């Protein structure tokens, strides 16, 4: 006995089937003149993939001919006029968002920071597209740009984000620091003035951090500022003579400042003690490079530093750093994100899944990533696990 599926007369069929391949148990990939179908032989449900210029990474041509699966599980799809398409076995692990003029999308293509508010909304800093807000619930983007009226973002080049209750602190390049009240939707801008010592010590900020004592630390291109809540102004703490692009706090209350060119600075606010950790070719157990992109204190209290030349781990007993040997395409570690004791490292040549003491797995564009290159600190582990 034979059964016919997907007959064109049913109104949901396909014409001119060229190839069949088992994708998974009870699932077939079907190549046709209408595109690529994923068909469930038990439920008779199917999903059609076809060419669509408005959808990133869609099929290059709807006329699908040969389909094969390689030894690694990758799917190769030949088309009539669109060349070859490839689906990585890891493709469904990553979801991409990119700017489009045709449908609701993120504004900007250069993404530098993420921040999550109490309602689960993701705030996104962009170099070229201002501030974005993404709602995972309805999958919609809203963006904020400078406007002629005063109640707007001061500049479109955004680099730092930090939540403080209902206030979102926003660091910009040359536009000062903005504070957006999420309840009222109003912006307040803090700037630098040479004749006002209680103003910020610079016009640009790449890192803003709220510590466990609810203090707000604002890093400029040169130094560190502490927000004075009572006076609504700033205390200029120290000129580091370097741009700070990340801040974190360890279990002992020390603040760690990652700088571009001057290594790591450790500061204890109560004891007012500073210490600088730098790379030294003549000494063992120093930082791998003085350009430190990021710092993470993990759930075990371990301190990790991502540098331009490798991943480093702090030895608390010896008060020094060891460089972790990793077999990865690029040792320029841009950010470190922890998820269930696994470290995710973004680099300039892909995303690395690293289990300390075990090994690495590298993901690239062929695995579904939008790009192999990441900016420093452009990553977040959101409350929904993504």
Task: Identify the meaning behind each predicted range.
Residues 1-386:
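Carboxylate-rich, polar loop motifs that coordinate divalent cations or form catalytic acidic clusters
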